[in-house]
C-alpha cells in the first residue's frame, strides 16, 4: 500500500482538504505567539490556498446559528468549539496542492529533491550549519545552510523527536488520541453540518473527566481504509491499517451518510515519553485481531 504521509504535501494531498480557520484548533501556537499574531498567520496561510484555487465559501460564520447550536450542546455539558471551515473536497485538495508545487518548481533557484533523505542535521558547537543529503542510490553530500527547517510531518514525527533528543532539545508529550470512526445517516447530523460543516465538540466524562472530542467530520462522505507504511527512515516497524474519512465537493459524489472520528484524548506524565509509539501500538493490536485489516462493528 502507498505511504500517504510522505512526499509533496504528505497526508494533506490525500485528505478532503478542510482548512480550520481558528486558533483554537490544530495546535498550540497560542502558547508561543499572541492570539492576534496567530490569527494573522492563519489568514496568511488561508489566502495562499485561495490564490491556488481553494473555494471561497466558508462554513461556520453564522454567529446566530452557532450560538443556537452551542446553547443546545451546553444542555448536555458539551462544549462546541467555534471554528470556521473552508472545505476543498478530496478531489480538489490534491489539485490545489499540485498547483502550489508547480508554481514553486518554476521559481529560479528553488529545487525539489524527491526520495532524498536530509539526515543527519549537521551541528557544530551548538549551531546548525546544514544537513547531509542522501539520494535513493545512496550518494551523499553535505549541504551548508544558515537555516534548516525540519518539517517531516506525521510520518517523520518520531524521527524528529530523535533529532531533538540527539541535540539536547527539550520536548513535551502531546496528547494521545485513541478512538473510533462513527458513521450515521445524514439526517442525524444535518442540523449541525449544514451550518458548521464540521462540528467540533468536546465532552468531559463524569467519572474520570476524560476528554472526548469529535474530529474530521465528513457530511455525505465515505469511510476509507488507509495504510501507514514503515514511514520516514523506517520509523515504524511495520505497516498499520487505520480508517479515515473523506468528503467530496461535488454533490454527485455525496453519500447518504456522515462520518466522524470520536477520540479520547489522554495526557501522560513522566516517565512516559513515547506517545507516538503508544498510539501505533494500539493500532497494531487492532490489526492483529483482524489479520492485518481494520475492525468494523455494527
Q: Could you describe each region identified by the protein language model?
A:
Residues 33, 37, 43-51:
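Conserved catalytic/binding loops enriched for acidic/polar residues
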Amino acid at each position: 500500500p502507498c505511504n500517504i504521509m510522505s512526499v509533496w504535501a504528505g497526508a494533506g494531498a490525500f485528505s478532503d482538504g478542510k482548512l480550520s480557520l481558528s486558533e483554537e484548533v490544530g495546535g498550540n501556537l497560542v502558547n508561543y505567539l499572541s492570539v492576534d499574531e496567530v490569527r494573522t498567520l492563519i489568514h496568511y496561510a488561508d489566502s495562499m490556498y485561495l490564490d491556488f484555487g481553494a473555494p471561497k465559501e466558508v462554513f461556520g460564520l453564522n454567529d446566530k446559528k452557532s450560538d443556537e447550536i452551542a446553547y443546545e450542546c451546553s444542555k448536555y455539558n458539551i462544549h462546541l468549539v467555534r471554528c470556521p471551515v473552508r472545505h476543498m473536497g478530496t478531489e480538489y485538495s490534491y489539485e490545489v496542492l499540485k498547483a502550489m508545487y508547480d508554481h514553486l518548481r518554476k521559481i529560479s533557484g528553488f529545487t525539489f529533491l524527491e526520495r532524498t533523505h536530509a539526515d543527519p542535521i549537521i551541528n557544530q558547537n551548538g549551531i546548525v550549519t546544514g544537513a547531509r543529503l542522501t539520494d535513493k542510490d545512496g550518494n551523499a553530500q553535505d549541504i551548508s545552510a544558515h537555516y534548516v527547517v525540519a518539517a517531516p510531518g506525521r510520518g517523520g514525527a518520531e524521527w524528529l523527536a530523535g533529532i531533538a533528543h540527539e541535540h539536547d532539545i527539550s520536548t513535551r508529550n502531546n496528547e494521545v488520541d485513541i478512538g473510533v470512526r462513527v458513521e450515521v445517516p445524514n439526517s442525524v447530523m444535518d442540523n449541525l453540518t449544514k451550518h458548521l460543516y464540521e462540528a467540533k465538540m468536546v465532552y468531559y466524562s463524569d467519572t474520570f473527566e476524560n476528554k472526548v472530542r469529535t474530529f474530521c467530520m465528513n457530511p455525505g462522505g465515505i469511510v476509507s481504509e488507509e495504510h501507514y507504511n514503515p514511514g520516514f527512515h523506517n520509523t515504524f516497524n511495520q505497516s498499520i491499517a487505520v480508517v479515515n474519512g473523506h468528503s467530496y465537493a461535488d454533490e454527485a459524489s455525496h453519500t447518504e451518510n456522515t462520518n466522524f472520528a470520536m477520540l479520547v484524548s489522554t495526557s501522560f506524565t513522566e516517565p512516559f515519553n513515547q506517545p507516538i509509539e503508544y498510539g501505533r501500538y494500539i493500532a497494531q493490536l487492532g490489526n492483529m485481531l483482524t489479520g492485518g485489516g481494520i475492525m468494523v462493528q455494527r
